[in-house]
């Protein structure tokens, strides 16, 4: 159950980052303020809930194991950026993500 909580904390943190990015995207001049307030409000909500879940995780998992698992955020954000905003990703970046995933698998297998 706690590992599921960790995954949700990670995904909410990513959602918060994506909402911040969306707040910087173009909006019509007459809707710009609402656009920014909406997306930054969602970002704060996601990041706040992620923090609460993260505190629950830290009560049950050593920080030396739990914190590296948040490196999955790099993977989720990259995949979302490619899908949502068609951002380019270099081969070097993909290789880096593969190393991150490998590291998480190694660390996760020690628990």
Curated annotation (Swiss-Prot):
GO terms for biological process: lipid A biosynthetic process; lipopolysaccharide biosynthetic process. Keywords: Cell inner membrane, Cell membrane, Lipid A biosynthesis, Lipid biosynthesis, Lipid metabolism, Lipopolysaccharide biosynthesis, Membrane, Transmembrane, Transmembrane helix, Transport. Pathway: Bacterial outer membrane biogenesis; lipopolysaccharide biosynthesis. Residues 40-109 form the EamA domain. Residues 1-35, 82-87 are cytoplasmic. One of its GO terms (cellular component) is plasma membrane. It is a multi-pass membrane protein. InterPro entries: EamA_dom, Flippase_ArnE, Small_drug/metabolite_transptr. It is found in: Cell inner membrane. GO terms for molecular function: carbohydrate derivative transmembrane transporter activity. It comes from the Bacteria. The keyword Lipid metabolism applies. Heterodimer of ArnE and ArnF. HAMAP family: Flippase_ArnE. Belongs to the ArnE family. PANTHER family: 4-AMINO-4-DEOXY-L-ARABINOSE-PHOSPHOUNDECAPRENOL FLIPPASE SUBUNIT ARNE-RELATED, SMR FAMILY PROTON-DEPENDENT DRUG EFFLUX TRANSPORTER SUGE. This is Probable 4-amino-4-deoxy-L-arabinose-phosphoundecaprenol flippase subunit ArnE. It comes from Escherichia coli O81 (strain ED1a). The lineage of its organism: Bacteria, Pseudomonadati, Pseudomonadota, Gammaproteobacteria, Enterobacterales.
